[in-house]
Amino acid sequence: FPRTISRAVQARGFIEEVLGAYSVSGNVLQGGGIDQYGEPSAIMNFEIAAQGLGAKYVLDGTDFAAAMFNPEGDAGDVEMWELISPFLYLSRRVKASSAGPGRHRGGSSFESLFLVHKTPMWEVQNLGTGRCFYSPGIFGGYPGSVAYIHNIRDNDLRERALRGDAYPVADGDFEHPALMEIQGEREYGHDSFT
C-alpha cells in the first residue's frame, strides 16, 4: 500500500513526499512472568517504533528513527526499559547491513542484546519479519534485511559481566559470528513468532 501511494504521488510531481516502506528488520521482544519486583507483569518492548524508514525519491531513508505506524516514535531510554522489565541491556547498536541498497539506500535498523535477570520465571517471545523480504524499494531498490532471533539460554553472560570480562555485543560477520563465544543453549529462528 505505501508503495502504491508513493508511486501515485510521484506521478503527480510531488517527489519530496515519496517514501518507501520500511522492512521491520528488527525484532519486538515481548513476554511476561514475574518481574524484578516480584510482581506479575507483561511487557512489549516498543523499540520497534524506531525502525529505519525506506528510501525517499530524492534522499536516503531515515536510520532507526520512527515507524510508519508511529511517525514520532523513538526507542526509549534503555534505563527506562530496565526499570519496567527484568531486562538488563548489554548493547543497543546500529544493525549492520540492514538498510536496503539502491540509488538511495533505505534506513538502517538497530539490534539489542538483553539479559533477562532478577526473575524466577519469565517467558520471552520474539516478533519480527523473518523468511521474506516484504518491502522492496519503490522504483527498483532492494529490500532491507529480514529479522532473525538468536536466543541463548542458561548462558555465561552474567558471570562474564561480574568478572569484568569482555563479551560480544553483536553477531559480527557471517564467517566468524561473535555471539558463538557465549556458552549456552541456543535458539535461532526466522519465524514471525518464536
What are these regions (language model features)?
Residues 1-194:
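Glycine/proline-enriched, intrinsically flexible loops and inter-domain linkers
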